[in-house]
Every structure is written in structure tokens, then in C-alpha cells.
Amino acid sequence: MERVLGKSGTHTHFRGNECVSPIYPPIDFQSLLGRDAWDSLPAPVRRRFGPHAAEGLSTLYEGEMEVRANPFGRLVAQACRLIGTPLAPWTGGAVPTSVDVHLDPRGGLVWARTYAFTGRAPVLVSSTKLMTDRGELLEVVRGGLGMALTVTAEDGALHFRSRRYFLTLGAWRVTIPGLLTPGRAHVIHREASGGTFRFTMTFDHPWFGRTLFQDGLFRDPA
């Protein structure tokens, strides 16, 4: 169990009986990666994750996704609908998908993904990346569920890997045992060609294997 603390306000605090939301510093991916690793990334990747991303600008990417899940992954995705749909609840191929990246008022960056599964209403899956003043990168969704992430640059691509899952309860982050999660998350952002990039996301569970898989090609806005 971890108390959410921080000198710059990255902690939940109270004003009287009112719980005040934390304010997080802007995400600086260059600082998280280190200068050499950052410079090894293609210019379009640096542009998408560069300082402009923290200036309040909204960017819309459109493309198609392949969305797959094994039985355990489908069970977890459906159960998570109780806390705001942090995982796509359906599967399909060539699913039209849009991603709106914009600033969160608390200082993080929101990735709002809208999936248009055939025969179903559009599904919004939203998560927010936050950086604490201790330099820890977090990704959180509704209901207080989140992951602590590591970010690396490998072979010209940006990689995000989960280190642990947690549930935020008031001023505390409670670690969730790995066996009770969809598994270790691994997200890859890789430059493609012609103003496009590939987004790949996998979850691997120690008992249930590859629980969730998503892969898609997205276009930069004109």
C-alpha cells in the first residue's frame, strides 16, 4: 500500500471535508527516456509525444484496429465495464477506431479511443497518462484503477510496459496482485510510412497466456 504524496501537489489532500484532486506535472517523455534514447526515435514519434502534447492541444488520429481476447480476457473486459469500460468489451477485425489525445485538467494526457464495432453502439475507452513529481509514469482509468509504467525506446519504437497494477482509495494506492489482473501490459508505438503509425497492445497473464491483443494502423491528421 502506497500513500499518494508529492511536493508539487501530486497527492490527494483534503480541504475541510472536501477531497481535492491531485495536480500532476506535465509529462516530459524526453526526461523519462533520457536524451540519447529520445533522439533515437523517428521525428514523427517525437512530435506526437513532444512538448506540444502538454500544451492543451487536441489531436485526433483515425485508423482501424484488430481487437482480440481469449476467454479470460473477455471475462475481465466485461467485468471492468462496472468501473467505466477501461478495456474494449468486444472483439473484431478492421474495427474503425479514432483516438483523441488531449490534456487532462489535472496535468496528464488523455487517450480517448472510440471503437465502432459492427452492429454495436460506439464504445469509448479512455485512459490518462500521468507523471508524478517523483518521475513515475502512471496510466489511470475511471474507478481508480491504474498501472505504473516503464517507458523505453527500442529499435526506433516507443515501448510502455506495466510494472504493477493499483487501485486508488482516497489518499492510498493499493497494489493489486498480478494474478487478479488481465496480465502484464505491453504497448508499442512504431512509425510506419506515409504519415501513419502502428499501435500494438498486448496483455499476458502468467496462467491464462495472451488475454488481450490489439493492433492497428493510424493516420496523422492532415
For every predicted segment, state its role.
Residues 4-5:
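Leucine-biased recognition of intrinsically disordered, low-complexity hydrophobic segments
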Residues 10-12, 16-20:
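Targeting/processing segments of secretory and organellar proteins
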Residues 14-16, 116, 208:
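Intrinsic structural disorder/low-complexity segments
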Residues 21-193, 197-203, 214:
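Soluble ligand-binding/transfer domains with enclosed cavities or grooves
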Residues 204-210:
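Exposed beta-sheet edge/beta-hairpin loop segments within beta-rich domains
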Residues 217-222:
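Short beta-strand-to-coil "C-cap" segments at the C-terminal boundary of structured domains/repeats
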